[in-house]
Amino acid sequence: RLLGKDPKKKRRTLFQRIGVQFQEGDYQKEIKVSELCKETASLYRSPADWRALCEQFGIGDKAKVAVKSLSGGERQRLFIVLALIPQPELVFLDELTTGLDAKARRGVWKTLEGLKEQGLTIFLTSHFMDEVEALCDEICILKKGTPVFCGTVEQAEKQCGCQRFEDAYLQLSDEEADA
C-alpha cells in the first residue's frame, strides 16, 4: 500500500500524489528544460511552479537550454525538479546526488530537509552512506533485493558494533565480503 491506497486499484489517484526521480532520464534530444517542465506540469491537477523549483535547485537560468546540453549535475537537479512538480506527498529519489559536486549535494540536502520538515515523505535509494546518514530517519538495507536490516542508522551501528554507519552498512550488506 502507498499512502493508504492499493497501487493496482488506485493508480490514477496515487499518480497525483507521488513524485519519482529516476537516476537516468531519456528525453527527446532537442527538448528544452522549460518544455519538459511544462509537459510534466500538464499531467497534474495542481502542479508546483516549475520556474520556482528550477530557481530553488539552481537551474533557473537553464529554461531555454536543451536538456542534452546540461551538465550531469544540472540534469540531475532537473530530474529532482520534475519529481517535485506534482507537489507530492511522497517522492521516490533514485541515487539522488549522483553527478553533483559537494556544494550542490549539500544544497540539495538542505532543500530536501526543508521539504521533509513541511511533511514530504522521501523514499531514497543511495549508495552514499553520508547522504543516508544526513537525510534518512529510517533505513532499510538490502542484500540481493532482500531486506537484511530495517531501523535507524544508530540501530544499525549498535547491532553491528560499529562506530561508523558505512562500516555497519558494509557488514550488513556483505558488500565488503563480495569485494
Walk through the language-model features, giving the residues of each:
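Conserved ABC ATPase "signature" region
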Residues: 38, 42, 47-62
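Conserved ABC ATPase signature
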Residues: 66-70
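Hydrophobic anchor residue at the start of the ABC signature
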Residues: 80
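Catalytic Walker B motif of ABC-type/P-loop ATPase nucleotide-binding domains
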Residues: 91-94
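A short, surface-exposed alpha-helical micro-motif characterized by mixed small hydrophobic
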Residues: 132-134
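ABC ATPase "signature
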Residues: 150-151
